[in-house]
Amino acid sequence: MAKVQYFGTGRRKKSVARVILVPGDGKVTINKRDIEVYFGLETLRYIVNQPLVLTGTKDKFDVIVNVNGGGFTGQAGAIRHGITRALVKADETLKPELKKAGFLTRDPRMKERKKYGLKKARRAPQFSKR
């Protein structure tokens, strides 16, 4: 018998997360490591689990994630986006609830490019009057 799997791709800043939802007991694996090992901060684990807790599907699916690029916060946001998309594929009735919470929306904020003549994107070199 073929296993039922739901796929979702999430993005945030420079991070890309490929998420697979498999019916199970709520185990979250990120890059072949447990979520507690991968994300040390409680806030990042909270961000990842938000869509599952909101929809009440925390202990119905095992989450397998492959994520790369960006930093910890970007990766957590990308995983949340991917889980949300996979949940919508699994059950279309969850879409309005997830949309209202803002989890389906791709966060468009990216790092602003550095401009010439400046030290960073907006930081100007120190000004000296004399």
Curated annotation (Swiss-Prot):
Entry GO CC: cytosolic small ribosomal subunit
Cite the entry's keywords alphabetically: Ribonucleoprotein, Ribosomal protein
In its UniProt record, a GO molecular function of this protein is: structural constituent of ribosome
Where composition is biased (Basic residues), the residues are 111-130
The protein in question is named Small ribosomal subunit protein uS9
Q: Which InterPro entries match?
A: Ribosomal_Su5_D2-typ_SF, Ribosomal_uS9, Ribosomal_uS9_bac/plastid, Ribosomal_uS9_CS, Ribsml_uS5_D2-typ_fold_subgr
Tell me the segments the record calls region Disordered.
102-130
Biological process annotations from GO? translation
- The protein's organism comes out as Clostridium novyi (strain NT)
User: Which SUPFAM superfamilies does the annotation name?
Assistant: Ribosomal protein S5 domain 2-like
Q: Which gene encodes it?
A: rpsI
Task: Family membership, please give it.
Answer: Belongs to the universal ribosomal protein uS9 family.
